[in-house]
Amino acid sequence: MIIYILFSLLAAVIVHLVYKKQTGFKLKGKHIVVVGGSSGIGKELVYELLKENIASISVISRSLDKLRSVVDDCPSEVCTKSTPLNVGSLKSKIEIYSCDITNKIKVKETIAQIVSKNQGGKIDCLINCAGFAIPGYFIEQDEEIFEKTMQLDYFGSLYATKEVVPLMIENGGQGGHIVFVSSTCGLVGVPGYSTYCPSKFALRGLAETLRSELKPYKITFSVVYPPDTDTPGYQQENLTKPEETVAISGGGKAVSPLEVAKSIVSGIKNGDYHIAYDVPTKLCAVLSPGLTPFYFSFFDILLAPICRLVGIIAMNQNDAEVLKSWKKRNQLKK
């Protein structure tokens, strides 16, 4: 045990000295595209980004009414602020585009519109924030729900990224930054989310692959793992969420989308690859790193065995909740 601890400490020190974190992304003066920015986390993210003296922000969503509300609902303390880059209302920096992101042709056309409208055609940062979930029991859900979830949560982000990456490569050697909003369900499998977890795991896999593949082009990445967040989508989820899923998720407690949005902006500026809001999710990120940058630098090595132990305990607790709910349902059938 002592040898293991000493070895871990030595490895941690070496990693701390050798490992180089990706450079933080400067938002000031940048053109940002937010996919899925008409409600929830995405909408709050638009307002938080406006505080960073960005040049402009293009918001993509399917509902035109919701897109208009992004402009109309902009908080006065944000959208009436004067900045060196834009004296007057910051509302003028918001551009809205109605698009069904599950349609790759429409996505291609929308990105082309955004490029043509912005001088120079630059897109400096892409934030993929669209997604939804329909919780339920695997044996009771139709295959169409799995397909629909994957189409929006994964392919919607893929289509936008596929169009934006070539623009970033041609961005005069400046590269860019791409954010994928995954979920805590993209780090661990949660009973009741068999339609949702695979789509969020897929985003992690895409980001992990592109982080290395596009490194020569100075394109950096962040993956966000929000916990349950009090959004319109979350309220809809609760209509079909199994009892054990509620218990495993913390009894139905949800965090503010504003707080999650703030953590995303902070993570982008800090150069964080993994962006998590709460401690449990951060520990899950340490437990499931893949071939990605460290979360806590050398502390990742020290925390790994502890996180694994906590993970086993959590797994057993989840299994107990599932069994408890299963027995309860069977009793009601009698």
Curated annotation (Swiss-Prot):
Which Gene Ontology CC terms are recorded?
Answer: endoplasmic reticulum membrane; lipid droplet
- Pathway(s) of this molecule: Lipid metabolism; sphingolipid metabolism
Q: What is its EC number?
A: 1.1.1.102
Q: Where does NADP(+) bind?
A: Y196, K200
Keywords assigned by UniProt, alphabetized:
Endoplasmic reticulum, Lipid metabolism, NADP, Nucleotide-binding, Oxidoreductase, Signal, Sphingolipid metabolism
Tell me the SUPFAM superfamilies matching this sequence: NAD(P)-binding Rossmann-fold domains
According to its UniProt entry, the protein's GO biological process terms are:
3-keto-sphinganine metabolic process; sphingolipid biosynthetic process
| The keyword Lipid metabolism is annotated on this UniProt entry | yes
Q: Describe its function.
A: Catalyzes the reduction of 3'-oxosphinganine (3-ketodihydrosphingosine/KDS) to sphinganine (dihydrosphingosine/DHS), the second step of de novo sphingolipid biosynthesis.
Q: Kindly provide the name given to this protein in its UniProt entry.
A: 3-ketodihydrosphingosine reductase
Higher taxonomy: Eukaryota, Amoebozoa, Evosea, Eumycetozoa, Dictyostelia
